[in-house]
Curated annotation (Swiss-Prot):
Residue positions where Phosphoserine is found in the record: 60, 64, 107, 237, 240
Organism: Mus musculus
Keyword Membrane annotated: yes
UniProt-recorded name of the protein: PDCD10 and GCKIII kinases-associated protein 1
Region (Disordered): 40-89, 253-286
UniProt biased composition (Polar residues): 60-73
Gene this protein is translated from: Pgcka1
Subcellular location: Cell membrane
Length: 313
């Protein structure tokens, strides 16, 4: 029994020692376990950890991720040297950022539990906004926090009536009643039918076309210059005014240049013809009272008087 084979058999039977192989993790992942069974893994430092079935199927994760996920859980027994070195680094990162990972995990878990318990209110948008406001309230600063605080009063101000119809409060309706009312204009407009049915003479006076060329100060405007829309009564009034003006001018002229000697009977005929010559313009042209015109008229009268005297002799 002292040979090498006997000693090896005796050691396997009476002193079993488990030596961890480098690929033991793959062996654990490949084994098929039942739902309620758990596997106890023995490490080199005699630390036992219970691993459920769901954790065994996720063995594709790296060692660093598995160690980071179990930092917040209590450990049984001493940790390996690598874990003890990485744990202070994680704690330093949490202190630098100002937010611990455990606090964020707890807040997320509490929000999920609250949503599961209140499943009936989860579908409404108002509850979603209120929950988000309570979760994000510590992180809001300045104007964002003010806007979030003003959200609830505005929602309370609106009144829901019927099947979701919103109505403004009574104060807004009272303000709307004070809007000034502008009455309709009293004056007739250009496109109104009252202007179309107006008197034709007034309409002609309103829409009278004035000539672009302004007349001279000493000459009265002609009838043709007043436009084609002037009625017959206005034309007759203009003609009468022109005739009266010409007769007054001629009468004043003959009074100033009265005859110094008695004229024969033939002069009366010439005098009757002269006004027709001066008054021949019926369109309102007024004779200018210049010195040259007066001299020409005097010479014409003298010539006609001499011819009449020769005929009488």
């Amino acid at each position: 029994m002292g040979c090498r084979c006997c000693k090896m058999i005796q050691s396997y039977l009476f002193d079993p020692v488990q030596v961890p192989s480098p690929g033991f993790v793959n062996e654990v992942n490949n084994c098929k376990l039942e739902e309620d069974d758990t596997v106890r893994l023995k490490g080199t430092q005699n630390s036992e950890v219970e691993v459920p079935r769901n954790a065994l199927h996720d063995g594709s994760l790296s060692n660093s991720e598995s160690r980071g996920s179990t930092t917040g859980l209590p450990h049984q027994g001493p940790l390996p040297q690598e874990d003890s070195e990485e744990r202070p680094c994680v704690e330093k990162q949490g202190i630098v950022n100002g937010i611990s990972p455990t606090a964020t995990l707890q807040s997320v878990r509490s929000s999920r539990l609250h949503q599961v318990d209140n499943s009936s209110w989860a579908s409404s948008p108002w509850v979603a906004t209120i929950d988000s406001a309570h979760l994000a309230q510590p992180f809001l600063e300045g104007e964002d926090y003010r806007k979030q605080s003003c959200l609830l009063p505005t929602l309370e101000g609106t009144q829901m009536v019927g099947h979701g119809d919103c109505r403004a409060p009574a104060e807004a309706l009272a303000v709307a009643d004070h809007i000034p009312y502008i009455p309709a204009p009293d004056y007739p407009q250009l496109w109104s039918p009252t202007v179309d049915n107006a008197d034709p003479e007034e309409k002609d006076c309103l829409f009278e076309n004035h000539s672009e060329v302004e007349p001279l100060p000493g000459i009265q405007p002609r009838v043709s210059q007043l436009g084609l829309n002037v009625p017959f009564s206005l034309q007759r009034s203009w003609d009468s005014l022109n005739e009266a003006g010409t007769t007054e001018v001629l009468s004043d002229y003959f009074k100033e240049e009265g005859p110094t000697h008695p004229t024969p009977a033939a002069d009366s005929g010439s005098e009757r013809e002269d006004p027709h010559t001066y008054n021949g313009d019926r369109e309102g042209v007024v004779v200018d009272e210049d010195a040259e015109v007066a001299e020409a008229l005097a010479a014409l009268e003298a010539a006609t008087a001499g011819e009449d005297a020769d005929d009488a002799d």
